[in-house]
Regions:
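Conserved acetyl-CoA-binding loop-helix of GNAT-fold acetyltransferases
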Residues: 101-115, 136-141
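Conserved beta-strand in the GNAT
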Residues: 69, 77-90
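Conserved beta-strand-loop-alpha-helix junction that forms the acyl-donor binding cleft
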Residues: 126-137
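Conserved catalytic-core motifs of GNAT/GCN5-like acyltransferases
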Residues: 89, 127-128, 145-156
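A short, internal acetyl-CoA/4′-phosphopantetheine-binding micro-motif in the GNAT/acyltransferase core
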Residues: 71, 90-102, 128-129
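A short, well-structured alpha-helix characteristic of acyl/acetyltransferase catalytic modules
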Residues: 1-56
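Active-site rim helix/loop that mediates acceptor-substrate recognition in acyltransferases
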Residues: 46-66, 73-74
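Long, contiguous binding/interaction regions
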Residues: 83-87, 100, 138, 151
Length: 156
């Protein structure tokens, strides 16, 4: 099992994109998970998260793997626009709706794959609902291949 205690505080990806080690910032992240459309993309249900559920999710991801915020520079200012995690052989990602369809997800996925390689992972899985076309496209563009109806795998 990888040693997650050595998780870097930042992973620089591009001049306008970096991954930042998770820290509690629910004022920013709770609105993402209260968006019914985004909840459907993530969990296939439109039920928004409450604060307790959000805390449980982040606690699980950050103690069983590596969890990062996706930080994007837009018009000269840095913004947290989503999160991405490596946990139990899989990657998961959320981009808030106002920053979707800008290539941020694809680039963040490529960056987290580099991190998985550093950790010695041989493959990374992603479960993506069949209706989530934009996420499927991002994972395929990052080099994943579809191995099941909703299963995608990246091999090193």
């Amino acid at each position: 099992m990888p040693d997650y205690s050595a998780q870097p505080k930042k992973i620089f990806l591009y001049d306008n994109l970096e991954l930042v080690k998770y820290y509690p910032y629910y004022k920013r992240t709770l609105p993402w998970y209260q968006d019914p459309t985004l909840c459907r993309q993530v969990d296939n249900r439109e039920e928004p998260y409450d604060l307790a559920r959000l805390k449980r999710m982040y606690r699980f991801l950050s103690t069983n793997g590596e969890c990062y915020y996706i930080k994007f520079r837009d018009h000269g200012r840095w913004h947290l626009v989503g999160d991405i995690s490596l946990c139990r052989g899989a990657v998961s990602i959320v981009i808030c709706r106002e920053y979707q369809n800008r290539g941020i997800g694809r680039r963040a996925i490529s960056g987290i794959l580099r991190r998985a390689g550093e950790l010695g992972w041989r493959q990374v899985k992603a479960e993506i609902y069949s209706f989530n076309d934009q996420s499927r496209k991002a994972f395929l563009a990052a080099g994943f291949r579809q191995t099941g109806k909703e299963t995608f795998v990246y091999g090193f």
